[in-house]
Amino acid sequence: MYKRQYLACANSVWAFIDTETGRPTRPQPKDVQLYGVEEPLDIPYEGRKIRLPEETDDLEAFPVRKHHIDTNEHVNNCQYVQMALEFLPDDLQIAQLRVEYKKAAVLGDMIYPKLSEEADRIVVELCDEQAKPYAVLEFKEEI
C-alpha cells in the first residue's frame, strides 16, 4: 500500500489572455472546467514579489542563444532557472525556489546577472543593459 506524500509542491499565478486582443480577460466557466478547480494545498504561500537585495555582485554578461528560445520566440521560463543555477554553489541543497518573471528576453538580448548571498537566501537577478530584471530568482536551503 502506498502512502500519499508530496515530493514537491508549487504555486503559480496565471493570466487568461484573449488571443484576438492580446489582453487579459476573465475566463468563462467552460474554460475553467477544462482544468478543474481543487482546494488549495496546505503549503506556505509567499508574496508575489521577491524582495530585492540591497547589495549585489555584478557577474559576467552573456547573450540569449537559440537554445533558450521557446515557440513564442522569447526565453522559455525554465531557461531563466537554468541560467541562474549556473551562479549557485555546487553544494547548495535547494529546498525552495521562487521566480518572478518581469519581462521577456529575446534572441540576441544580453543578460546581465546580479548575485546576492544573504543569510537565509540567494537571489539572482537576470537583467537587461539598464539593470531592469527579466527575471528575479530566490533560492533557499530551508523553508
List PLM regions with ranges.
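A structural signal for short, well-ordered beta-strand segments
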Residues: 10-14, 60, 97, 101
